[in-house]
From Swiss-Prot:
L-methionine binds at residues 57, 100, 240, 271. The keyword NAD does not apply. It catalyses: L-methionine + ATP + H2O = S-adenosyl-L-methionine + phosphate + diphosphate. GO terms for cellular component: cytoplasm. Its EC number is 2.5.1.6. The gene is metK. Keywords: ATP-binding, Cytoplasm, Magnesium, Metal-binding, Nucleotide-binding, One-carbon metabolism, Potassium, Transferase. Belongs to the AdoMet synthase family. It comes from Alcanivorax borkumensis (strain ATCC 700651 / DSM 11573 / NCIMB 13689 / SK2). CDD domains: S-AdoMet_synt. This is S-adenosylmethionine synthase. Homotetramer; dimer of dimers. Its cofactor is Mg(2+); K(+).
């Protein structure tokens, strides 16, 4: 927020164990929803040395080869040998998936009036800010780009000693609410045992950090922490147990906006934890893109089995060109925030979810909730 003079956010790579779990859950969701767009899916994953455990509730008319999906995701990430601490080809895959509760289903199923109740109660937030071209907070945006580049250089063998697990953290200095300098960068990456620490640190600086961060933000006092603990050979599920839904701040706005607490991955769009958070981003981004405010946070809330949101509120942090209450009226006029309305507005019954499960659900083009197609209608209020 603008009151902070310094702000820090972090990200993790696709090879981080929690992100592995997210990607597995979303790959299973995609496989099911591809054949059965109206399926109900809530899939959780745990990964630890030598095994992946999948559990949850599913209601569907299709069948998917769950074990094959799990193995392929792990191999795609890059865990393909025991030398790396995990091998998707040989790990155990345990299946604990059951059916969706009939009590939940009855409140969510669509009635004749096209109403569809929310899959659960809860509160969700959406956010946008004009401090980057993507209308995302700069600290989390650049944190994502660092680990994304780490994965790219690992996969194309530019830095062949890189391994899949990595974390980044970026601390930015703000002046009048705008980022102006990098105070600190942390990048920890798993690596093969044959690379010297000095060589690793130099390569990470020259090939990952400097190409990603704006040169004009780097200064003589910027702190760089590259693998600050030294050796990082043991990583991934061998180093830490990974669970779906444990990186909800990485998935959203890096802590710069509030969070309702609900995770995204493994959940079909009838779950408002996911779909309403996507809608919140869509609404907030269009408000900022339309010039109604330079920063916008929206909160929506729901009751299980009820279609209409129990509340819609907006905070523009004093940057609004019109009042926050007037913006709420515009939101109600131009955006359908009932669960079915969100699904149709954002075309969410498609197998689009696995790519969201690494490097952030927001701020990347190609997702329907990143469109700014409502800006002209919203500008009419100015």
């Amino acid at each position: 927020m603008s009151e902070y003079s310094i702000f820090t956010s972090e990200s993790v790579s696709e090879g981080h164990p929690d992100k592995m779990a997210d990607q597995i859950s979303d790959a299973i969701l995609d496989a099911i929803i591809k054949d059965d767009p109206h399926a109900r899916v809530a899939v959780e994953t745990m990964v630890k040395t030598g095994m992946a455990v999948v559990a949850g509730e599913v209601r569907t008319n299709t069948y998917v080869e769950l074990e094959d999906i799990v193995r392929q995701v792990i191999l795609d990430i890059g865990y393909d040998s025991s030398e790396k601490g995990f091998d998707g080809a040989s790990c155990a895959v345990l299946n604990g998936i059951g059916k969706q509760s009939a009590d939940i289903a009855i409140g969510v199923d669509e009635a004749e009036e096209k109403e569809m109740g929310a899959g659960d109660q809860g509160l969700m937030f959406g956010f946008a800010t004009d401090e980057t071209d993507t209308l995302m907070p700069a600290p989390v945006y650049y944190s994502h780009r660092l680990v994304e580049r780490q994965a790219k250089l690992r996969k194309n063998s530019t830095l062949p000693w890189l391994r899949p697990d990595a974390k980044s953290q970026v601390t930015l200095r703000y002046d009048n609410g705008k980022p102006v300098a990098v105070d600190a960068v942390v990048l920890s990456t798993q690596h093969s045992p044959d690379i010297k620490l000095a060589d690793l640190r130099e390569a990470v600086m020259e090939e990952i950090i400097k190409p990603v961060l704006p040169e004009e933000w780097l200064h003589k006092d910027t702190l760089y922490h590259v693998n600050p603990t030294g050796i990082f050979v043991i990583g991934g599920p061998m180093g830490d147990c990974g669970l779906t839904g444990r990186k909800i701040i990485v998935d959203t706005y890096g802590g710069m906006a509030r969070h309702g607490g609900g995770a995204f991955s493994g959940k079909d769009p009838s779950k408002v934890d996911r779909s309403a958070a996507y809608a919140g981003r869509y609404v907030a981004k269009n408000i900022v893109a339309a010039g109604l405010a330079s920063k916008c946070e929206i909160q929506v809330s729901y009751a299980i089995g009820v279609a209409e949101p129990t509340s819609i509120s907006v905070n523009t942090f004093g940057t609004g060109k019109i009042s926050d209450s007037a913006i709420v009226d515009l939101v109600r006029e131009h955006f359908d925030l009932r669960p079915r309305g969100i699904i149709e507005m954002l075309d969410l019954r498609k197998p689009i979810y696995r790519p969201t499960a690494s490097y952030g659900h927001f701020g990347r083009e190609g997702f329907s909730w990143e469109k700014t197609d409502k800006t002209e209608a919203l500008k009419a209020a100015l």
